[in-house]
Amino acid sequence: MNILVSSLRVVVASMGLCVVGYTGVILGVAQAVTPATADGSLVADASGQVVGSRLVAQGFSDPRYVWPRPSAVNYDAAAAGGSNLSPANPEIATRAKAIIAAYGVDAPIPADLVTASGAGLDPHISLAGALFQVPRVAKARGMDEDSVRGLITRLAFAPGGPLTQDRIVNVLELNLALDAGA
């Protein structure tokens, strides 16, 4: 019986140390070193109201905004995941055709604008995907296309640094910059 009680104490102490102690230390270090990312990379609008995270996509359908990649989980972070559909599945083609129709163009569309990412929550689109949307956004906002194009180019970055050729744009940050009139 003593061995059982001793073993139980060791298990409870180990769980407390690993679950509470380790987590507390890691959270404390993260808060001290990078508080913004430790809190979820939250993004605020001009009034200071938190409107989202730099790391999680949001759905935008208003023509005044740049639209993100489609999401297989309707931009629900709790349900993150892909559609698990085969590329040969007819539902993929049907979904892509509906998205293309929403853009209202016959021109070739960048692939990332009609295909969901693996988790369905990718907050970035390609520079080409953002630039493709310039005419619609500029018209809806009554802005000059060159102004919108310049803002997109300014916010585009190479995720792998100088070794990465393709540049991407964070959709939420771009839309907030558009709202701010940057």
What would you call each of these model-derived segments?
Residues 2, 6, 18-19, 24-140, ...:
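Flexible, solvent-exposed loop/hinge segments and secondary-structure transition points
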Residues 139-182:
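Extracytoplasmic/periplasmic C-terminal soluble domains
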